[in-house]
Each structure stands twice: as C-alpha cells, then as structure tokens.
Amino acid sequence: MKKSVLSIIGALFLIVGATTAFGDHHGGSKIAPKTVIHVVTLTWKDDASDEQIKKALDGVKTIAKKLDGVTRVWTRAIKTQGDHGHAFVMEFADEQALKDYAGSDAQKEWYKVYLPIRARSTTFDITN
C-alpha cells in the first residue's frame, strides 16, 4: 500500500512539475510556488454506488467554487495502484487557505456525502 501511495504522489509531482516547467518556459509561474497541494488517496466502501462516488468527487469541485483560497482541483485518477482506487487533489493559494478550509462550512457540507462512503484515505499536504 505504501508503494502505491508513493507512486500516486510521484505521478502528481510529475504533473505539477510539468505544468510549472511549461509555465516557466513561457514566462509564467515560479519554479517553486507557495501554493499548497492537498493530495488524498482513498478507497471507497464496498457498498458505495457509482452515483455516490460521483457526488463526492463533484463535491470537491463545489468546494473550489465556494472558497476563494482553492485555486484548482483534480478529481480523475488516470492510474492507481494497490487498493486505493481513487485520488483527488486540491490546490490552495497558500498555507492559510488550507487552514481556512479545515473545519469550514464548505468542508462540513461536503463531508455529509464523502465520509459515509469513504472506507479509508491517506492525505498529504505539500508545499515549498
């Protein structure tokens, strides 16, 4: 399981790195941004329906619309390993934005659809 989580995180770093490198080549973003990425790998409960899973992942996008500090989200895992069959990423403007998200009304509302179908998850918060 540790290997699969590290593989997913490695892939996410490649994606973020490629995006950053492309932006820098064109005079865009900094090499080491101060944004925070909130990486969550997860396994759904066996009885979670496709509709419930879709609603939970769509909820990640809804959070981004409700909170100014969320700059981007990713909800479609292209490749996963081990028993963590899904992942999502939220990018926050800075560490304060991540702190503002924790315990927010938007998070609490989303938890109503997410937590009942989540079997387990692993979270990493990463910045420079």
Could you say what each language-model-derived stretch is?
Residues 7, 17-86, 93-100, 126-128:
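Short S/T/G/P-rich N-terminal loop/turn motif that feeds into the first structured element of a domain
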Residues 99-102, 109-115:
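Short, exposed beta-strand-loop hairpins at the edges of beta-sheets
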Residues 115-124, 128:
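C-terminal partner/receptor-binding element of secreted or periplasmic proteins
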Residues 1, 16-17:
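Low-complexity intrinsically disordered segments
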Residues 1-9:
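Bacterial N-terminal signal peptides that target proteins for export
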